[in-house]
Amino acid sequence: MRAYERLLNYVVVRTPSDEHSTTSPSSQCQFDLARILADEMTALGISDVSLDEFCYVYGKIPATPGYENKTSIGFIAHMDTVSDYCDHDIIPVVHKNYDGGDLPLGTSGRTLTVKDFPHLPSLAGCTLITTDGTTVLGADDKAGVAEIMTMAEALIKENIPHGPISIAFTPDEEVGGGTDHFKVEKFGAQFAYTLDGDTEGEIQYENFHACKADFEITGFAVHPGSSKDTMINACLVAAEINNMLPGLEIPRETEDYEGFYHLTGMSGDVTKAELHYIVRDHDKNLFEARKETLRHIEKNLNEKWGEGTVKLMITDQYQNMAEIIAGCMHLIENAKKACENAGVAPLVLPIRGGTDGCQLSFMGLPCPNLGTGGHAFHGPYEHITAEGMDKAVDIVVELVKLYAE
């Protein structure tokens, strides 16, 4: 079975994670796909398949006889999807021999356009998989799941020599909980790769340092007709906070290694207001400087409006795994060579986000990220090609071969 065929089967199983949940996994529906995957792994002949109470699926492919002492490597992908644009069933649409031009997405009124996605002409002639324009596709990261499963099938059925291989499928990556209950020792690999990137051939090991920053603003309500020098409007103080941040250091205006402040939510009235940000930077010193900027804003506004008016809470989320991967750059060099062996130009790029591999690297499992062939994740324009997925599978198979040498 080709990887894209598996993807079509997986995306119709709803698995949105829930950022407001306090359970693990954050949504019980993730077990629906986990059980399907565990059964499929067993049917393929993968060993030691297990599904635990936290919705982690593990499995192993024992080394080919004579290769038991080769480096053990693992492959990881996440089962959950973002909850945005996912309030009903996903309907994938297959466009064979795509012409590379603008493409209406069902009857949604949305169109996949070359203007918005300039890479589309390069996909001409491919089998393109899109949504109907009303949901995400879920290729993030069910494409990675499908590619790992297809790799496993190839290793087993084609008797490709390999060392010990570990596989895991995780829940809750999209809400930052993908490694909360990951058992590194049970997984059993010395090194691993997540398949959670974009274009096939991407190799990523430099991610953001990340935190979230929440402001709570307490106002002072007085009748507006008699509020001279008395009222403190919490909404206006909230506006002050945002205006004190650098206006060009937002996601829309940044790229590559540039960091940002991203306002993800706001609410309020005269008496109470809230601002919710995520803060990102690749450079540790610049990241700490961003947090200090936020603390400075809190201090200044409390001096202006009175102590306790503004309360800032900063919560660190993940770190840049580059400092860990720097000690095992064979992971990157072998990934480059695997791409070349598969006929794909390697593309080493910084991750403008994070993956499960970020946390796993700091848990003792160095774990860079590889591309899946997908594009425009987290929205109704998400798309992927069957051919790109085939190449992603070829790359990981070549990677396995390299570690068996």
Question: Which residues does each PLM region occupy?
Answer:
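Metal-dependent amide/peptide-bond hydrolase catalytic core
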Residues: 234-405
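A non-catalytic alpha/beta surface segment that caps or lines the substrate-entry region
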Residues: 22-70, 74-76, 80
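Active-site metal-coordination/substrate-binding segment of hydrolases
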Residues: 67-161
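N-terminal capping segment at the start of a domain
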Residues: 2-28, 129-130, 318, 378-379
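Phosphate/diphosphate-binding glycine-rich loops and adjacent basic-rich segments that engage nucleotide
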Residues: 194-227, 231-237
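Short beta-strand segments
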Residues: 76-78, 168-170, 193-196, 216, ...
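Glycine/charged-rich beta-loop-alpha catalytic/anionic-binding loops adjacent to active sites
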Residues: 120-135, 218-222, 342, 374-378
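Acidic/histidine-rich catalytic neighborhood of metal-dependent amide-processing enzymes
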Residues: 121-208, 248-268, 272-282, 288, ...
